[in-house]
UniProtKB/Swiss-Prot annotation:
Compartmental location: Cytoplasm
Binding residues annotated for Mg(2+) 2, in chain numbering: 113, 116, 278
Species for this entry: Actinobacillus pleuropneumoniae serotype 5b (strain L20)
Co-factor remark: Binds 2 magnesium ions per subunit.
One Pfam family hit: FBPase_C
Subunit structure: Homotetramer.
List of residues binding substrate: 116-119, 209, 242, 272
GO molecular function: fructose 1,6-bisphosphate 1-phosphatase activity; magnesium ion binding
Protein name: Fructose-1,6-bisphosphatase class 1
Gene: fbp
Catalytic activity: beta-D-fructose 1,6-bisphosphate + H2O = beta-D-fructose 6-phosphate + phosphate
Amino acid sequence: MKTLGEFIIEKQAEYPEAKGELSGILSSIRLAAKIIHREINRAGLSQDILGVAGSENIQGEAQMKLDVFANETMKKALLAREEVAGFASEEDDNFVAFENDRAKNAKYILMTDPLDGSSNIDVNVSVGTIFSIYKRVSPIGSPVTMEDFLQEGRKQVASGYVTYGSSTMLVYTTGNGVNGFTYDPSLGLFILSHPDMKIPTEGKYYSINEGQYVTFPMGVKKFIKYCQESDEATKRPYSSRYIGSLVSDFHRNLLKGGIYIYPTSTVYPKGKLRLLYEGNPMAFLAEQAGGMATDGFNPILDIKPSELHQRVPFFVGSTSMVKQADKFMQECAE
């Protein structure tokens, strides 16, 4: 039995030049995940943490009370260890520069969706936390700048998510494969339960909000029809599974094989998901697990961000399914 802490130390030992900063950040995330897990598990017992907070994020979306709690928990956990120089969140209008001396001398910045799928909390559906870590590009010792956050996804040094479901799992990559750790609340420890995770090349699930079908581009409509058609050679029809929480849908497809799609639409002409907080970290995980992630045409990780809360269409999952979806998108764009 190997704990997350032991695993982090073991991996750090493989890099003699490593000074432990990244390990410290992962430990901060581990602590934040435990605290968020505790609050989610008692959400049905306390009206103080259920429902709408009465505020909106920069995208104009109503913030749930647990959104605000998770955001502040992540921020405080990172600030306590002083291993990141700055922090950006889907819930904040702008990035936060940590101003104390040790934090300003840190090499890394972190971006997060602190509680993905939070609108599901009130009905006891799985939610998650997503995180993404980069090396800063601004001079060490100075406050972080916007350029530190507007980096292509290929420059990530680590990304991952925590899924709060029937069990709580932390899944992450540092660019050398994907590993999953299940939380044992009796011990207070994350235990390595899913080493070297690989997404099946061929999938059998497609995850998309079909209630928005009439608003989708023709390429997506054709792919949905393709998924629903019978064909023994490709084991179709595929099964439709859509939870409405990116982390939960991605996690199922990572284990079982499938594709998750949130495309452009007449309602969201640029897509709905955020490139920096959702697209890049999940795309990094997908590629490290042997899958693919695109915007329907090009790899997500190659997109150069132009703004902090940039939206992107998102196709992620088993390689064969993403390639097929992209093929329909490209044919309909010609």
